[in-house]
């Protein structure tokens, strides 16, 4: 028996949401239609793909094995449709369709949000669906067309994915003038041990600050005393303005505070080495990266960062 892409899509969505009703909402179909498609698929493969109880649903071992094939098939079918749309758009003179885009929360709010409206205005038949998240998403599983991610190098290669650098991000040490008047201005990194320091924190972050100097052959590591952590750089910036200590921040998060002299830079001769990286990189599956609308967005964002 031939299995349709619609049937596979229903299976993939139930696996994603672990809910028939959730899959129905995602596909715009009633629960009965989703259940019928999943039952049809199980009959075709002659095995149970989900274990069911009155309270929950879960993939069986066979279902987990089949999911990878189903995801790839659904993605390939969707990509083929999108490529046909792109071909039509190229011949009709305009971009159309949807770009499902994800980006880091802070960079997305502070930088990306300033640039996207003009791109949407430039292409009135194009739709952008933006998800701001610091989680590394599974592009195929979550049907993401383009992911903007932190990376430690301009070419952040990942197996099976295409990538292009979008922008560079400068990380800097900053403090409020009032704090420095009270606590003194550090001249060497080792002096940070005597200061209150603040960290833009994410999972796996710690209180060891690593930095490079043009005159130093090796990076140095300074263990700092951090009284304030936050997973949002704007929050750390506000605490720094209030005089809570010295902060390590991405430059875009404190541009206005530096211009107004609410903050000043310290240790300017030293370059931070962060776990976030110093680049924003566009990542997509090779098929998605070849789409005309995705290519257009990547080129546009690179031009804005130039």
Language-model regions, residue ranges each:
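Conserved amphipathic alpha-helical core elements
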Residues: 41-42, 263
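Short helix-loop hinge/linker segments at domain boundaries
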Residues: 54-57, 64, 75-100
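Central regulatory/effector-binding core of bacterial HTH transcription factors
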Residues: 96-162
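C-terminal regulatory
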Residues: 141, 155-281
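A late-sequence structural motif
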Residues: 268-306
């Amino acid at each position: 028996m031939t299995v349709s892409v619609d049937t596979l899509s229903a299976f993939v969505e139930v696996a994603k949401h672990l809910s028939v009703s959730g899959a129905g909402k995602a596909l715009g179909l009633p629960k009965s239609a989703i259940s019928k498609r999943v039952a049809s698929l199980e009959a075709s493969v002659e095995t149970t793909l989900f274990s069911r109880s009155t309270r929950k649903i879960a993939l069986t071992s066979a279902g987990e094995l089949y999911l990878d094939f189903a995801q790839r098939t659904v993605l390939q079918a969707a990509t083929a449709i999108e490529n046909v749309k792109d071909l039509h758009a190229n011949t009709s003179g305009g971009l159309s369709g949807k770009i499902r885009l994800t980006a880091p929360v802070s960079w997305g709010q502070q930088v990306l949000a300033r640039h996207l409206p003009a791109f949407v205005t430039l292409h009135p038949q194009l739709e952008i669906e933006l998800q701001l998240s610091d989680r590394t998403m599974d592009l195929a599983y979550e049907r993401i067309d383009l992911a903007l991610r932190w990376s430690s190098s301009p070419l952040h290669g990942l197996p099976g994915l295409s990538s292009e650098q979008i922008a560079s991000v400068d990380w800097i040490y900053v403090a409020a003038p009032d704090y420095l008047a009270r606590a003194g201005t550090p001249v060497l990194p080792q002096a940070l041990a005597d200061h209150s320091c603040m960290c833009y924190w994410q999972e796996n972050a710690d209180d060891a600050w690593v930095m490079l100097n043009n005159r130093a052959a090796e990076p140095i590591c300074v263990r700092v005393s951090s009284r304030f952590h936050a997973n949002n750089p704007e929050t750390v910036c506000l605490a720094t303005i209030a005089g809570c200590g010295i902060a390590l921040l991405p430059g875009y998060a404190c541009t206005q505070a530096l211009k107004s002299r609410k903050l000043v830079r310290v240790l300017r001769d030293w370059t931070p080495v962060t776990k976030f990286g110093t680049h924003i990189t566009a990542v997509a599956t090779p098929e998605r990266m070849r789409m005309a609308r995705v290519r257009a967005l990547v080129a546009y964002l690179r031009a804005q960062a130039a």
